[in-house]
Amino acid sequence: MKPRTTLRPSRVGAPALEQGRDAFRKQAWGEAFSRFSAADRKSSLTPEDLVSFAQAAFLTGREAEGADILSRAHQAFLSRGDTQLAARCAFWLGFTLLINGEFAKSGGWLSRAGRLLEGEPDCVEKGYLLLPEGYRLYQTGDPVAAHAKFVQAAASGERFGDKDLVTLALQGQGRSLIRQGEIARGVALLDEAMVAVTAGEVSPLNAGGVYCSVLEACGEIFDLQRAQEWTSALEKWCASQPDLVPYRGHCLVRRAELLQLHGAWPEALEWAERACELLSQPAPKAAVGAAYYQVGEIQRLLGRFAESEAAYQRASEWTKTPAPGPAQLRLAQGQVDAANAAIRRIAEEVRDAGPRARVLDAYVEIVLAVNDVAAARVAAEELCGIATRWDVAFLRALACRARGAVLLAEGNANAAIAELRQSWGIWCELDAPYEASRVRILIAQACRELKDEENARLELAAARQTFQRLGATKDLTRLSAIWPGQFQSPGPLTEREVQVLRLVASGMTNRAIAGKLKISEKTVARHLSNIFTKLDLGSRTAAAAYAFDHNLV
C-alpha cells in the first residue's frame, strides 16, 4: 500500500508531523505511528499523511486502528476529488479484509472501489482490483482463471510503472502455476518477485506479504532449499525493522518447520509457541492455524499426546483445512481404528497434490497398521506419481519409503530394501535424522525377514540412538515392541536432558548452559522441568545428587 502522488504540504506546522514523516522514511514504524498520532490530535492531516499513518499502524500490529485511519484517508481523498486515490484506499481495505477471511466487509469495500472507478480512464487502481479476483479464483480451485487475472494485473503494473502491483501479480502467477502442477515455471516467477522484494523495490506491507506467500509456496512444494534461503532473508528483513509486528509469526512457523525436520525439536517447539503468541494478534486465520498445528506436530513426535491434541484442537479453531496430524496422533496412541477412519476421510477431502502428498504418506502407514495392504499399494503408487511429476527430493524420499513399506508388507523384502535404501539416502542428504531413522526401522524389519539378524540389529541400534537423542519416546517404545528384549531400557532421559543434567551437576547456571549448548534459556528451563518430572526431583541440588549417584559426572 503506497500513495502514488507526491506528499502535499500539510497545513500543520507542528514538529510532530515532520518527525512522523521522517520516521516513516526511516522505517521506524513505532515512532512514526506515535508522531503521526500526536500531529493528528492537534490538527487534520492530509490524505497522504493519513495513508502513511495507516501503514505505520498496520506495520506495528494495530490493524483495527490502521483500518480506521485508512478509511479516513479514503473519505479525505473523496472530499478532495481524488477518485482514483480514494478507490486505492478502498481497495486496500477490502483486500486486507479478504486475506483475513472477513469476506462480507471485504466485498463491500472492493465493490465501492470498483464503483468509484467505473467512469475513470485506465489507471493502475483498476489493475489492483484484478488481484482479489485472482485470489478468489485461486482459493475456489480455478488456478487457470486465477493465473489469467494475475497476468492482466502484472500488465497493468508494467504500464503504470507500479512495482508493488507487478510483484504482487508475479507471486500470484507463480502460485497459480504451481497449483496447476507447473512447478518450474511457477517457482521462476516467485524468484522474480523475490528479487524485487530483496532489492527494496516494494513497499514494506507488500514486501512482507510476498515473503509469507513465497514461503508458504515453498512448503507446499517441499522445496527445502528455497524455504531455508527465503526464511533467512525474511528473518533479516524483520530484524532490520525492530518495530515491525506482522510477518514475524509467519517467519517463526517456517523456522520451526525446518528445525523440526533437522531434529532440533525443543528449539522448534519454542519457535512454534512464540509464533502462536505473535499470531494471537490480528493475523490471517490460516497463519494462526499453521502455528498451532506445528506445535501439535512437535508435541506428537515428543510423545506428549495431551499437549499435541490440545494444539491440534486450537489449530482446528482457526482453519478447517484437513491435515493428517490428528490421525497420526491416534495411531501413536494405539487407537488404530480411529486413526484409520480419520485418515480415510481426510484422503477423500484433500485433492491438491502438495497437501495430498503428506496425507498419502500418513495414509500408507495407517492403513498398513490395519493390514489393508491393497489400499496402501494404491496410495503409495499415487504418491510415487506426484513425486515423479514434481521431482522434489523430499517427495522422492516419501515415495520410496511408502513403496518400500508396501513391498515389505507384501513379503518382497529384497525389493523393499532397495526402495528403503533410496529413501534413507535422501533423508540423510536433507539432514532429516528422524525421518531417516524411521526408514531404518523398516530396513531392519526387511533384514529380519531375510534372516540377516546382524544388519537388522545394526539398523535398529542406529535408529534407537537417534530417537533417544531427539526425545522420540513413542518411537523408542515402538522399537521395543518390534524387537522385544533387543535393547536395555534407554532410561527416562533423552540425550539432551542428560547433557543438561551433567552441566547442572557441574554448577552451571541456566544462562551458562544455554551458551554452552547454543540453545535458549527457555529451552534449558524446559529440559530441567522434564528432568525434575521424569526423575521425581524437586531441586537442582537433588538433580546434581542424582547425576553423581548414576555416574553421569
Locate the predicted segments by residue.
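Tandem amphipathic alpha-helical repeat scaffolds
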Residues: Q19-R25, V51-E63, A87-F103, E125-D142, ...
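Helix-turn-helix DNA-binding segment
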Residues: A418, A461, P484-G538, A542-V553
